[in-house]
Amino acid sequence: MSSSSVSNTLSIETKSDPKDPAFVASQESTECNEHDTTQLSGSSSEPLENNSSLTRSTDDPSVEIRSKLVSPDNEANLLSDQNITISNENNNENDTTEEAETSSGNEAADDEDSSSDAQSSVPSFSEIHDGMSEEELDKERKTLTHLRRISLQGADDPEIPTDWSVAMSPPETEQDASTLFWVPANLHPELNPTGWKSFLDLQVKNLKSPTATDTSSSPLEHIRSLRRRKSLLSRQVKADDAVINYQDGSPIVEKAYLKRHRSLRLNELEHLESLARDPHRMVSLVDGMSNGSPEDSPLLVSPNHFLQRSSRTTIRRTGASIRTIHRGKTSTLSGNRSHSILQKPTDTSPLHKIEPISADELVESDDSRTSALSNSQNPSDDVENQSDQALEVLSLTNPPKIDNASADTTLHKETNKIDKLYVSENKAESAVASESSLSEGTLALKAPAPENKPEKSSTSKPPVPENKAEDSVVLKSSVPEDKSENSIASKPSATEGIPENAIALQSSVPENKAEDSVVLKSSVPEDKSEDSVPSKSSVLEDKHENSVEIDKKADDSLPSNNKTEGYTPSVVREEKNYSEPNASPSVIPPRVPTPVPGRTLSPKPTRIPTPIPSSLNVSLESSKKPEIFHERHIPTPETGPNKPSKNNILKSTQVPVTPKQKSSTANKGSTSSPSPPSSESKKTKRSWGRLFVSGDSDKEHKEHKKDKQKKKNDQISSSSKSASSFKKDRDKESIFGSLFGSKKKQTEIPPVSSSPPHNDAPPKAKPISAPSELPNTTSVAEAKCQTVTDDEGTDQQSDEKSTEPKTFIPDKDYYWSRFPICTERAIYRLSHIKLSNAHRPLFQQVLLSNFMYSYLDLISRISSNRPMNNVQQSTAKPIRKDINGQQRRSEFSAENVKNELENLSYQFGDQRKRNLNRKGSTIHTVSQNIQKVSKNAK
């Protein structure tokens, strides 16, 4: 009865769509409440009064679920507030209900006891209501409603944006799941630090002022959807697409591409050519352009001016060696230029109206330019200025436009004048070249280079014209000014700025010894020669006290049939160069010498040719043949198969001198030693010995070796023979044998002084003998006499010296040097560390990587040239002793320490390579190997 009355009395006014999920939720809640009332109505009327009322306001579109405990005091207010009308259909029914309730009082008392027990176990609504405020209840209801909606819509997909009004609310507890919000991947702090920071700032701002929370300010508002979009290329063109206004875009794209990348057409090229011919139109066209940036302005180049490659290229290398390459004569260049002038287009532009320059003015300007060149002090600048004269003169000659016929005649006249002018210039230059070639006496000069690098030295072979045979050369010794000048420079054929009488031929000798340089002088009358010779050379000549003695000894060494009273011998220095006897008439330009600081070249004097003396015929014949100069030391047959023997060394060129020198040389007298007769005949066979090792050189080498061995058999004891053979075997198996080629580059002239072995000369930079015994011994004949007339004690001393090990000095014997292995490893590791820094500038990274790779190349080269068995043999060798049995040097000398350090470094390097290949290597094995190496060293 009570259930039916409840259903009749509770009427819920709802005006909404039954499909609304909020309406469904309200229906579910009403069903639950009705079920509760049916259970409680049978026992008493209090559950009916305490029943929670459900309402839906017609004004509010949303549904609010409210649970309130209703007391009998505010029952009327509650009913009026929530718009629930309870119709009293029959007062009799109310009375009957009250009677029924009172009649069943005893039963209700029993039921209340059982219900009170159930309420004691479950918390009642009053207890929950007392602990929560109204705002908290409203918040909980909103959260439940939001979760209900998400669960009904299936919002478990994280691609759906969250409700920022709920997600940005202040958290209740740290473990509350509702306070967590989903952050998209593009706001990750490592991927997008600025976006993450702005997102956190927005969170803090919303937490501080929750009323100003705006859901539209979320960082995801620009994201349409996180789902994968459909590909735009997935659509296929169909036949019926034309109905839907489909248009193929490929022709449009192709037209746009051709418009951007098409080449110039013929009419456009013609238009550009016409603009180039008429600069006024070009200027007016450019002025008419608006908003043109200055860097976009066109380059107005006249069509008759064109870029031409220089006729000469000067290649500058380190080491003061300059090489000049000529590509053509100035006459051909002038002919080409005149041809281009004849083809000059006709235009009335004022830019091209230049008054013609007469040939006389050209000659005057050329003479002034030549005189200025002769007064300059820089030889390299003179060479460059001399070759640029043709282009400078031709650039000034640009005749104006008159008539066609008159212009042709004028142009022909001007070009003929220019051609004649430059033909005369070429003749003068060829005369200068012939003078320089004869003054040098066809001496093949080149810069000194290490013996294992012949490609760095260039050869100059000027010809010897017979009609210029009256020129003579006087060779005098002078002191060089700089030790670093290692190049012997000859006078260029086309150089006018360098006087003929002041060409210095310099060669360097190691340490502090005075060098002997050769100055070539042209023989002129006495008054002219005194004026033209620089005063510095005379002062330097006075400084050398031993120059007279050298000339005297060299004079004695000349052949008797070539000796005349008026000739003075020249100081000969051997050079690793061979000239071809039948040289071509074309002049190969020699190296241009670098200017020496502090040295002033005197201007070129007027040349007065002297008649050819009858006694000069023999000297001319010998001057036509190539001559060999000593540069640093006198090599012997042991200097390699491509080196000349003593028999192949020619005497110096014999030339006439001034009367003063005749009087000075007439007083000299001495016995002359005959020279080998086969020197000239053998020399002609070895013209290209530098480039090709011929069989003749090997035969000569063997023959000379046999002769020398026969001479030594009478003087050298058996012990010295065994020592020399031991030395040869040691040289073959030496550590640096493969690095420096053969050991035959050492000189065979025995040093007289007993200098310590570690001061022995490197093959390229050590004098022949000690300064105390052989001062400035430079002539070939004197060196021969020294080798032949040496006594037995000197030979034994040289043989004893040969048994000592050869010590190589860094930066003298070889161009590389190594640090201790620990230092090298530290440098290498530091380079790796520095290279790993990406902020380091690029040029520093390049320098470091170049250093590392050059270091690795050096280590690999040394390791490949130094086998380990030789290293172990060298470590096991006992300390060498003299013939007398005395210890030669200390065990802890610099050489022994250096050798031991190198052995340790190589052993450790190989062990490290093996450890890298074998992954299971440990530090213990490395230490054991080091101990073994140290034991072997001891």
Curated annotation (Swiss-Prot):
Residues 40-54, 116-126, 429-440, 715-725 have a biased composition (Low complexity). InterPro entries: Zds1/2, ZDS1_C. Residues 587-596 have a biased composition (Pro residues). The gene is zds1. Residues 1-140, 326-386, 424-807 are annotated as: Disordered. GO terms for cellular component: cell division site; cytoplasm; cytosol. Residues 57-67, 127-140, 467-485, 512-556, 622-635, 798-807 have a biased composition (Basic and acidic residues). Keywords: Cell wall biogenesis/degradation, Cytoplasm, Meiosis. GO terms for molecular function: protein phosphatase regulator activity. This is Protein zds1. Residues 1-13, 77-86, 330-349, 370-380, 558-567, 642-669 have a biased composition (Polar residues). It is found in: Cytoplasm. Has a role in establishing cell polarity. Also required for maintenance of cell wall integrity, sexual differentiation, calcium tolerance and cell morphology. Involved in Ras-MAPK signaling pathway at cell cortex. Has a role in meiosis. Residues 702-711 have a biased composition (Basic residues). It comes from Schizosaccharomyces pombe (strain 972 / ATCC 24843) (Fission yeast). Pfam families: Zds_C. GO terms for biological process: cell wall organization; establishment of cell polarity; meiotic cell cycle; positive regulation of G2/M transition of mitotic cell cycle; signal transduction.
